[in-house]
Amino acid sequence: MTQDQLKQAVAQAAVDFILPKLDDKSIVGVGTGSTANCFIDALAKHKGAFDGAVASSEATAARLKGHGIPVYELNTVSDLEFYVDGADESDEHLNLIKGGGAALTREKIVAAVAKTFICIADGSKLVPVLGAFPLPVEVVPMARSHVARQLVKLGGDPVYREGVLTDNGNIIIDVHNMSITNPVELEASINAIVGVVTNGLFAARPADLLLLGTAEGVKTLTR
C-alpha cells in the first residue's frame, strides 16, 4: 500500500470508530494536515449523523465547510467527545510530536478539550524515541532570538522556519537533533521559556488511541 492509501485506511478506521457513538448533537474536533484531510473526506459522507465540527486551523475549517459540514468556534462548544488528528511522530506511549503544518497551538487546545483524542497515522510515524522529526515551537516573533538561545541550552539545534506565520500570527522554530527520552518534562521546560506559545510535544495530554496504518491493516494502540 502507498502512504496515501495507508492514510485513507486509518482515516476510514477513525470514522468507523466514532460513528456509532455520534448523534445529531455531537460535535467532532478535527486536526490539520494530509491525514486529517483524509479523515474529513471520509467523515463528510456521514455529515447527517452529527451536528458539526471544531477546526484546529483555518485550512481545516475551509475543507470542512467545503463539504457542507458546519464549523463551530470552540468557545461556543461545551462538550467535545472526539478529537481526530494526525502526527509527525508517536512513541509506544502515544506521546506525539505534532506541528509540521504549523497548527500545533490550536491542535493542542482542541485536544485538551476533547474527551477522547484519536491519533491517525501511517506506520512510519511510530518510533522508539521521539525527536528524529524536528520539534516545532510556536514563538511570539519578538522573542525569536531569546527562545532560540534557551533551546540551545536544552540541547537542541533551533532553526527558524522562514516564511511561515501561524494562524495566530506567530513564528515557528524547529528544534533539530534532540533525542526526547522524557517528553513530559521537555514539553514543560520548553513551554516555560518566556516567548514560547507552546511546543509540538503532546505528552502532558497524549493521544488516547493510535490508529496505525500498516501493510497488514490498521493496528490499534492504546495507552
Curated annotation (Swiss-Prot):
Q: What is this protein called?
A: Ribose-5-phosphate isomerase A
Q: Give the enzyme's main class according to its UniProt record, as a single word.
A: isomerase
Kindly state the subunit structure of this protein.
Answer: Homodimer.
The biological processes this protein is annotated with in GO are: D-ribose metabolic process; pentose-phosphate shunt, non-oxidative branch
NCBIfam families in the cross-refs = PRK00702.1, rpiA
Q: Does the keyword Isomerase apply?
A: yes
Q: What cellular-component terms does GO give this entry?
A: cytosol
Residues bound to substrate are 32-35, 85-88, 98-101, 125
Active site positions: 107 (proton acceptor)
Which Gene3D superfamilies does the UniProt record give? 3.30.70.260, 3.40.50.1360
* Biological or metabolic pathway of the protein: Carbohydrate degradation; pentose phosphate pathway; D-ribose 5-phosphate from D-ribulose 5-phosphate (non-oxidative stage): step 1/1
Name the Enzyme Commission number(s) assigned to this protein: 5.3.1.6
Give a short account of what the protein does: Catalyzes the reversible conversion of ribose-5-phosphate to ribulose 5-phosphate.
Q: Which UniProt keywords apply?
A: Isomerase
Question: What's a Pfam family this protein contains?
Answer: Rib_5-P_isom_A
Query: Reaction catalysed by this chain?
Result: aldehydo-D-ribose 5-phosphate = D-ribulose 5-phosphate
Q: Which HAMAP family match?
A: Rib_5P_isom_A
Q: Does the keyword Iron-sulfur apply?
A: no
GO MF term list: ribose-5-phosphate isomerase activity
Could you say which protein family the record assigns here? Belongs to the ribose 5-phosphate isomerase family.
